[in-house]
Amino acid sequence: VYKRQVVGLGFGMNLQASLASGKEGMEFTVISVVGTMLIGWFIGRKFLKVDRDTSYLISSGTAICGGSAIAAVGPVLRAKDTEMSVALGTIFILNAIALFIFPVIGHALDMSQQEFGTWAAIAIHDTSSVVGAGAAYGEEALQIATTIKLTRALWIIPLALITSFVFKSKGQKISIPWFIFFFILAMVFNTYAVSYTHLRAH
């Protein structure tokens, strides 16, 4: 089920727009993704004493794109259903809160459209919540937030591959997350098939 969700995400993404957005938000994205993964893992394991898989799942969802990242990493980790449920529940609750509270904080701090869009894309996990918060703040904030968020979503690919190497048991063969390649194919199909259909229509 989780693998199909990740592939489905690809059908909603435009490859060209995602790569173009990478040039604009790359610095923020790299720092936020790597930093969040490290800090999340450290806090979860050392302070909250959360088990390894749940801590890694929550960190992945926080760093990249919420439930989609958890759905991508879970099968690679061979995470239990209970661990997946806890991670997804945690992320979705935080997203729901962020959707309503971020625009209020943005206005209270008198953030510009660009500042809020960048902040929302980096700090809010799930794509739908980023879009909702951006739209509530303004059209420009929505465009900036969506653009940077696309870049973060692409990190699903290296994250799943790295996870398969890092969490490989001794003597166990590396499990290649093949569904990630279907995610890429879905994104390519959505980009070029839609463009071709649009051109034929005109």
Where are each of the predicted segments found?
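Helix-coil boundary and interhelical linker segments in multi-pass alpha-helical membrane proteins
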Residues: L15-S21, H107-Q114, A136-I144
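Interfacial helix-loop-helix linkers and transmembrane-helix boundary segments
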Residues: M13-E27, K46-S55, A79-M84, S169-I176, ...
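Alpha-helical membrane segments and immediately flanking helix-loop junctions
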Residues: V50-A98, E115-G138
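Hydrophobic core segments of alpha-helical transmembrane domains in multi-pass membrane transport
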Residues: V6-F11, G40, P158-S164, I180-Y192
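Oxyanion-binding "anion nests"
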Residues: G138-S169
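Transmembrane alpha-helices that form the ion-translocation and gating core
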Residues: F28-S59, I93-M111
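Structural signature of hydrophobic alpha-helical transmembrane segments
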Residues: K23-V34, E115-A120, T146-L154, R200
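Conserved small/polar residues in nucleotide/adenosyl-binding loops
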Residues: V1-Y2, T197-H202
